[in-house]
């Protein structure tokens, strides 16, 4: 993400007014990844809100869902991760998107895959709601077979480290900002899973954790859905808009400093100038 400050001249009558143009360059983007059995329709409410922040948003359907529901019994985690990479690449390739300012929002199975995505694509901000965990083995087996594992729920009650799971290992390597959202009464992705994720983000720039009181995995109650939307949008506002404001402050401060230098460089008192000419850029260092 970048902010640019430029001096401009505004013609009026026979004169030219001195002005300053302050602009962001490159638009941040948000990729939404739905959960198992879901669809992009579940993401559109949050995407609509994120667009209000000035973000480009993309939702899509994983194979095994909607138009590719015929693949439901055979689609694998590897294929769905490829789906996410393809969607990410299309979003990042848009000419007006800043490829260093992309957020990924993943739900449940989509959250698990989104964590894995961070090892293969630059993700500046990562929001995970009730991210699932699966055993590493049988990566290329149909995803449906994973849910049939009688030990899966026991696995999700265990204390696991990045050495035990590839998704947690990806989290340990991640250096961006993280939002973790837990449903208090989630019987599918219980609290130990969220604890394992939180403990894995040892190198994250920031980690925000929220619990939606009384909520189940599906956020069946409308008020819980609304609370999640507010939580996500508030966090995105802090990350994206806050970053833009910080960069704008930086270029304005740089302009002030440069004007002071110009004034100090003049030997005759009172001969300084408050007119600035040129461009100043402030670039945010990305996590990648």
Kindly give the residue locations of the regions a language model identified:
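Hydrolase active-site cap/lid region
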Residues: 116-160
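Conserved alpha/beta-hydrolase
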Residues: 49-69
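Short alpha-helix in the alpha/beta-hydrolase fold that links the catalytic acid
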Residues: 176, 190-200
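The serine-hydrolase catalytic nucleophile loop
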Residues: 36-49, 62, 192-193
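Catalytic nucleophile-loop/oxyanion-hole region of alpha/beta-hydrolase
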Residues: 37, 65-95
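Short beta-strand/loop motif that positions the catalytic acidic residue
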Residues: 174, 180-182, 186
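N-terminal cap/lid segment of alpha/beta-hydrolase-fold proteins
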Residues: 1-24
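Catalytic histidine-centered segment of alpha/beta-hydrolase-like enzymes
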Residues: 215-226
């Amino acid at each position: 993400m970048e902010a640019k400050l430029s001096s401009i001249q505004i013609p009026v009558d026979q004169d030219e007014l001195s002005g300053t143009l302050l602009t962001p360059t490159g638009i941040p983007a948000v990729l939404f990844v739905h959960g198992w059995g879901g669809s992009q329709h579940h993401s559109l409410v949050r995407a609509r809100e994120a667009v209000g922040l000035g973000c480009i948003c993309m939702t899509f359907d994983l194979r095994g869902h909607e138009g590719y529901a015929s693949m439901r019994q055979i689609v694998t985690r590897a294929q769905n991760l490829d789906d996410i990479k393809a969607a990410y690449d299309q979003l990042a390739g848009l000419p007006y998107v800043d490829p260093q300012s992309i957020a990924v929002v993943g739900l449940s199975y989509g959250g698990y895959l989104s964590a894995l995505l961070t090892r293969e694509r630059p993700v500046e901000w990562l929001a995970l709601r009730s991210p699932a965990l699966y055993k590493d083995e049988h990566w290329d087996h149909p995803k449906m077979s994973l849910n049939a594992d009688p030990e899966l729920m026991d696995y999700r009650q265990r204390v696991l480290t990045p050495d035990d799971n590839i998704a947690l290992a990806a989290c340990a390597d991640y250096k961006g900002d993280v939002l973790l959202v837990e449903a208090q009464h989630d019987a599918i992705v219980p609290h130990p899973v969220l604890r394992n994720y939180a403990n894995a983000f040892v190198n994250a720039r920031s980690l925000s954790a929220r619990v939606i009181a009384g909520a189940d995995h599906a956020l069946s109650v409308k008020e819980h859905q609304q609370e999640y939307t507010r939580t996500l949008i508030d966090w995105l506002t802090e990350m994206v808009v806050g970053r833009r404001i910080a960069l704008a402050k930086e270029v304005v401060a740089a302009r002030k400093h440069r004007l002071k230098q110009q004034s100090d460089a003049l030997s005759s008192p009172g001969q300084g100038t408050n007119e600035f000419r040129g461009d100043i850029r402030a670039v945010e260092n990305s996590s990648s």
